[in-house]
């Protein structure tokens, strides 16, 4: 099953997350199919904290991908900010 979830990157104490479409059997930070966006919880100033490619996200959802609870919350937050 394909899931859309967060893959952690960044340095110690400086988290950065890629929003990826991946097979559910792969590790959290392991192999993924496609990068759909990113989330930077420590963004400040002019940096963007959340970027999501909504076209690709919709494509994966139409093809049966499940969103993790955190990604679902972030997508809802991004849609609210865009409106």
Curated annotation (Swiss-Prot):
The keyword Repeat does not apply. GO terms for molecular function: structural constituent of ribosome. InterPro entries: Ribosomal_bS16, Ribosomal_bS16_CS, Ribosomal_bS16_dom_sf. PROSITE patterns: RIBOSOMAL_S16. One of its GO terms (biological process) is translation. SUPFAM superfamilies: Ribosomal protein S16. It holds the Pfam family Ribosomal_S16. GO terms for cellular component: cytoplasm; small ribosomal subunit. Keywords: Ribonucleoprotein, Ribosomal protein. NCBIfam families: S16 (TIGR00002). Belongs to the bacterial ribosomal protein bS16 family. This is Small ribosomal subunit protein bS16. The lineage of its organism: Bacteria, Pseudomonadati, Pseudomonadota, Betaproteobacteria, Rhodocyclales.
């Amino acid at each position: 099953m394909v899931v859309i979830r967060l893959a952690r990157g960044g340095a110690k104490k400086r988290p950065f997350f890629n929003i990826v479409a991946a097979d559910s059997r792969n590790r959290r930070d392991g192999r993924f199919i496609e990068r759909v966006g990113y989330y930077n919880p420590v963004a400040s100033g002019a940096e963007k904290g959340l970027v999501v490619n909504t076209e690709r996200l919709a494509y994966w959802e139409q093809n049966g991908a499940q969103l993790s609870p955190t990604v679902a919350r972030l997508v809802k937050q991004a849609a609210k900010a865009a409106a």
